[in-house]
UniProtKB/Swiss-Prot annotation:
HAMAP family: Cas1
Organism: Rhodospirillum rubrum (strain ATCC 11170 / ATH 1.1.1 / DSM 467 / LMG 4362 / NCIMB 8255 / S1)
Region Disordered, annotated ranges: 1-21
Name of protein: CRISPR-associated endonuclease Cas1 3
EC number(s) per entry: 3.1.-.-
Amino acid sequence: MVGSGGTGAPPPRSSPMTTLYVTQPGSVVRSEGGSLTVWVETEADDPGPNDSPVRRKRLASVEPHRLESLVLLGFTTITANAMRLCMANKIAVSLLDGGGGLAARVVPPEARSADLRLHQYALHLDPPERLIRARAVVTAKLRNAAAVLRGIRSNQASSAALASAITQTEASAEAAAAAVSAESLLGIEGNGAHQYFAGLRTAFVGGIPFLGRAQRPPPDPANSLLSFGYVLLGNRLTGLLEARGVDPCLGFFHDLRPGRPSLALDLLEELRHPVVDRLALRICNLRKIQPQHFEPDAERPGGVKLTVDGRKIFLEEWEGHLARPLREPGVAAEHRLDVHRLLQRQVDRLVSDLRGGEPYRPFRFGTSRPG
């Protein structure tokens, strides 16, 4: 199955730049007539003596200027010519394994900015400046987590566990704002995340339970959804950073690790709960995703992944979710940004900070007052 903008068909000309997801096993992305086409080969039913035993079916054809990224999931491939077409049109290509984990990214030559990266390196090597930004990231993450839990409380019967989780997560946010070292900040973040997920656990009331956050690999359907969503959102942030010439691997809160986009993960922290967790909760509680949409992950023993049909459902919901505005304190409804534009704004804020402008301001989710 192919999803473009989550619809299974190319977006209309008036739509913004989008992502093409290729999920049907055996699909091949080709370059034909200046367009990216997706084909799948299947065995023909009762072929005649002169017929080919293989049937080819075209699933989609998209003009490259309408795309910003291409995501291949599981057993799907891309030809060398199609890859060249993507690079020529500045389309980032991401390869995800069957469980939704990121295997590789292929990106066009970067628009590197030497002065911008020098500023980034200088901040990274300045522990006090790095701590200031790491504190802002973690504080925003925990405040947004508490706001998500308050939203849950307003939409369903509260419980002692949920009320306690809100209080403890808010307390962790205040502690993060006052952290005096990177080590203490890491401990505060871990404790706050534990309290938050204990509260989120009470909100899954559909056919898919959530027993607590677990990963590497995700052992159950709810964790599989969260992990998949985090990969998709982090991948999008990585692409935006690369497009601005920022080094996505040099973060402030997340340490350096080979191949890890630490800066993208920093930006992800303030967004993962308002964006990914709320979507996973909604589609589970509305039973749009059900237990039959998951299967054991053969690539990661003990893990669980979405089936092909499950991925289709999730990606359709995902793209729709990214087009919805998010609440911000003090921002009127008509001025709220959808997730696409919000991500770009946050990257713009970061770039301004790196160039010596206003210190980075993380996204704040929710209303001005708790409750």
